[in-house]
Amino acid sequence: MKAYQREFIEFALEKEVLKFGEFTLKSGRKSPYFFNAGLFNTGRDLARLGRFYAAALADSGIEFDVLFGPAYKGIPIATTTAVALADHHDIDTPYCFNRKEAKNHGEGGNLVGSALEGRIMLVDDVITAGTAIRESMEIIKANGADLAGVLVAIDRQEKGKGELSAIQEVERDFGCAVISIVSLGDLITYLEEKGNATEHLEAVKAYRAEYGI
């Protein structure tokens, strides 16, 4: 695990974005941890969050032309990632996001920001069912662009309804890499390193044994 990944886990715990306990997911599964990126909700939080997304992008080596943030949660993520890439990596990246409702006045259309062209890096908080990615792919294709990859904050590394995870299904269906700042495996490594979270560690390991990919 790299330093920025460890720092991201500590940041998420500090802001209570990442919690350990018992949580019922939409799927009905009882999960020993929960991640709610909506709690990164101040200017300083967003600035720090962007640095982690930018670090993961730089680490991935994936080449892309435009950052795309799907409405709504992806919008501030794309914005802060673009700022962090410029400030910390000297990469001036165009960014774009969509509106849920197309405008019929002013500049019109359902896209805001840069033109959606070339190789697109989609940024979002998590992938659960992959629905937002599929909707975004329709927008990307309609603009004649290609999906270079997808970056999310956390990869839960768990099966969906079949044997694959939602992320693996996206990789299979769209032929692109899906990367994350951290994964479930990184959380387990972090808990093992801490040495004082045995209860949480055992619960997360048991969850991975049952639902992990």
Swiss-Prot record:
Q: What name does UniProt use for this protein?
A: Orotate phosphoribosyltransferase
Purpose: Catalyzes the transfer of a ribosyl phosphate group from 5-phosphoribose 1-diphosphate to orotate, leading to the formation of orotidine monophosphate (OMP).
Q: Which GO terms describe its molecular function?
A: magnesium ion binding; orotate phosphoribosyltransferase activity
Q: Which cofactor does it need?
A: Mg(2+)
Task: Name the chemical reaction catalysed here.
Answer: orotidine 5'-phosphate + diphosphate = orotate + 5-phospho-alpha-D-ribose 1-diphosphate
Q: Which Pfam families match?
A: Pribosyltran
- Show the SUPFAM superfamilies listed in the entry: PRTase-like (SSF53271)
Class in the EC hierarchy, top level: transferase
Task: Note the subunit structure.
Answer: Homodimer.
Q: What positions does the entry give for orotate binding?
A: 34-35, 128, 156
Q: Which family does it belong to?
A: Belongs to the purine/pyrimidine phosphoribosyltransferase family. PyrE subfamily.
Q: Which residues bind 5-phospho-alpha-D-ribose 1-diphosphate?
A: 26, 72-73, 99-100, 103, 105, 124-132
Annotated metabolic or biological route of this protein: Pyrimidine metabolism; UMP biosynthesis via de novo pathway; UMP from orotate: step 1/2
What's one GO BP annotation on this UniProt entry? Answer: pyrimidine ribonucleoside biosynthetic process
Please tell me one Gene Ontology term that the record gives under cellular component.
cytoplasm
- What Enzyme Commission number(s) appear in the record? 2.4.2.10
Q: Which organism is it from?
A: Vibrio parahaemolyticus serotype O3:K6 (strain RIMD 2210633)
Could you list this entry's UniProt keywords, alphabetically sorted. Answer: Glycosyltransferase, Magnesium, Pyrimidine biosynthesis, Transferase
